[in-house]
Amino acid sequence: MLGIIGKKLGMTTLYDEAGRSVPCTVITGGPCVVTQIKNIEKDGYTAVQLGYDDKKEKNTVKPLMGHFQKAQTTPKRKLVEFKEFGKELGKEIQLGQTIQLHDIFVEGEYVDAIGLSKGKGFQGVVKRHGFSGVGGKSHGQHNRERAPGAIGACSTPSRVFKGMRMAGRTGGQRVKITNLRIMKLVPEKNILVISGSVPGAKNGYIILEK
């Protein structure tokens, strides 16, 4: 699996070959540093750990400082592991090597975007699951417009089944959006523009895979 770590900058609009407007997300990706290389002999599988976004040394715990010193790099805020990275890239990866955006992606191909969705706090079933509420707004209905309705049967089975959609904490979850096209790639500025929206707020971390 090939990928890179980046940040969401915002959204814009581009036009495709047919002249249709396409809502797009602007992402800054990399450069990332190889902070660890895993192999079958020692770890049981092959993978590459990439680090992104510099962090102050005084805010880094000593075990992690040793981890970064082995790679001869500055502390990083975000660490992500990609399996079979070197094999798919087609060349040997070295510890401390810098991975650029144009090393992984080309304009026109499709990628997957992973991010942390915006947290909404405790929400009801209408906002959380798209419920329509109970009944109409006449005929004596009272405070039922956004109610969940029945959540189970009576004496049989005498319980509420797992997975019942109810009110609760909404958002703040890892979300993956697949098959987003790279509309534009600006390698000198480490920026790419992909079609559609990606999860998370501005300046949130985004993992791009292909």
UniProtKB/Swiss-Prot annotation:
GO terms for cellular component: cytosolic large ribosomal subunit. This is Large ribosomal subunit protein uL3. It comes from Amoebophilus asiaticus (strain 5a2). It holds the Pfam family Ribosomal_L3. NCBIfam families: L3_bact (TIGR03625). Keywords: Ribonucleoprotein, Ribosomal protein, RNA-binding, rRNA-binding. It comes from the Bacteria. Belongs to the universal ribosomal protein uL3 family. The gene is rplC. Gene3D superfamilies: 3.30.160.810, Translation factors. One of its GO terms (biological process) is translation.
